[in-house]
Amino acid sequence: MTRLNVKPTRMELNNLKARLKTAVRGHKLLKDKRDELMRRFIESVRENNQLRQKVESALVGHLQDFVMAKALESDLMVEEIFAVPMREVNLHVETENIMSVRVPKMHAHIDNPYGDDEGDVVYSYVASNSQMDETIESMSDLLPDLLRLAEIEKSCQLMADEIEKTRRRVNGLEYATIPDLKETIYYIEMKLEEAERASLVRMMKVK
């Protein structure tokens, strides 16, 4: 604890008591914020882990299927299949406020740039094989999960940063500001009591 460098007057005492009251209230609010952020962070980490396992498992399976399907096609045909984008993805990113942390919310709108009549693929079914078609379709279906995974991971990063900032502020109030204010208030109260006793002694001597 460090006593603040202030004059031991009643005015300073009142000011310090007001500052202490504000600091205590701020400490409670910050602790509540930290605890709620921790709760949200843990929930997001759990969801992230589950979704990441799901996505990674699906990607491994789709990659294996793609390798098998690719073996049935010529390299030129595979290049032609992926030369033209199958779908057009418009990504709109908004933000959501979680305990003063602005986390991303992603919304994807997927269009077939060649019109609904063209279907989901823009290459010839005859030129491809069913395994390739199914693999490409399955990979496309992963897009919402991939976007959600990116959204969660960015949110976790932002919340972790804010939790650390809030933790430092809580500790600063708990272990420095509040103890220093209490120590200074105690010191001023002692000084004022001493002054009152000295004044009383002088008055008694005069009488």
UniProtKB/Swiss-Prot annotation:
InterPro entries tied to this protein: V_ATPase_D
Record's signal peptide: none
Any Pfam family hit: ATP-synt_D
GO biological process: proton motive force-driven plasma membrane ATP synthesis
Keyword NAD: no
Keywords associated with the record: ATP synthesis, Hydrogen ion transport, Ion transport, Transport
Gene Ontology terms, MF aspect: ATP binding; proton-transporting ATP synthase activity, rotational mechanism; proton-transporting ATPase activity, rotational mechanism
Function per UniProt: Produces ATP from ADP in the presence of a proton gradient across the membrane.
Family according to the record: Belongs to the V-ATPase D subunit family.
HAMAP family with a match to the protein in the record: ATP_synth_D_arch
Protein name: V-type ATP synthase subunit D
Species whose genome carries this gene: Streptococcus gordonii (strain Challis / ATCC 35105 / BCRC 15272 / CH1 / DL1 / V288)
Name of the gene encoding the protein in the UniProt record: atpD
